[in-house]
């Protein structure tokens, strides 16, 4: 299976890194981080995103967001699934309105036109009517809108356990088997 992970410049970069860390090793992963993602990772978490991604997934393929001619920009390359974690509202707007000027939005556009799973984890609060309309437009185009929302039924005691719940739910939405969080009613 081939999966693209897009990391845009919204708050919550550690969630993308946790997703990358927990992704089953047999999945071939292609990662595109926006320029702003690198800035936000450093400012918010003191993380060198380029190094962190390569440390977590040495076998991954990493692209520059401006590499619009990369293999993953074409539907014929055969990417099976894509996740954008976190998804900035700027990125959401670009995808919702068909602007594919960078590799993340172009790859997402390909997923929509090819009717392949595209998970978008919007990271903003509160949401304006325009933001909600853009998310609705993407949902109508069969994108999976899955914001990083906390849960309490799992009784998570650590930040890592909360992150694993989110990553597990995202994996579920993409059809990736996992045991990252306790299932409701299964003790």
Curated annotation (Swiss-Prot):
GO-annotated molecular function: carboxy-lyase activity; flavin prenyltransferase activity
Catalytic activity reported: dimethylallyl phosphate + FMNH2 = prenylated FMNH2 + phosphate
Keyword hit for Transferase: yes
Residues that hold dimethylallyl phosphate according to the record: 153, 169
Keywords for this protein: Flavoprotein, FMN, Prenyltransferase, Transferase
HAMAP family given in the database record: ubiX_pad (MF_01984)
Name under which the protein is recorded: Flavin prenyltransferase UbiX
Gene: ubiX
């Amino acid at each position: 299976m081939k999966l693209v992970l897009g990391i845009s410049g919204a708050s919550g970069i550690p969630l993308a890194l946790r997703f990358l860390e927990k992704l089953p090793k047999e999945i071939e992963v292609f990662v595109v981080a926006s320029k702003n993602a690198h800035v936000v990772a450093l400012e918010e978490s003191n993380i060198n995103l380029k190094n962190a991604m390569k440390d977590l997934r040495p076998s991954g393929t990493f692209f520059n967001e401006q590499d619009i001619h990369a293999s993953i920009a074409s539907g014929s390359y055969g990417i099976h699934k894509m996740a954008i974690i976190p998804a900035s509202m700027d990125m959401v707007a670009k995808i919702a309105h068909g602007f594919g000027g960078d590799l993340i939005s172009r790859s997402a556009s390909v997923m929509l036109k090819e009717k392949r799973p595209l998970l978008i984890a919007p990271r903003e609060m509160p949401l304006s009517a325009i933001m909600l309309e853009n998310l609705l437009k993407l949902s109508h185009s069969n994108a999976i809108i899955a914001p990083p929302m906390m849960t309490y039924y799992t009784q998570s005691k650590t930040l890592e356990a909360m992150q694993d719940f989110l990553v597990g739910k995202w994996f579920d939405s993409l059809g990736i088997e996992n045991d990252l969080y306790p299932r409701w009613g299964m003790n």
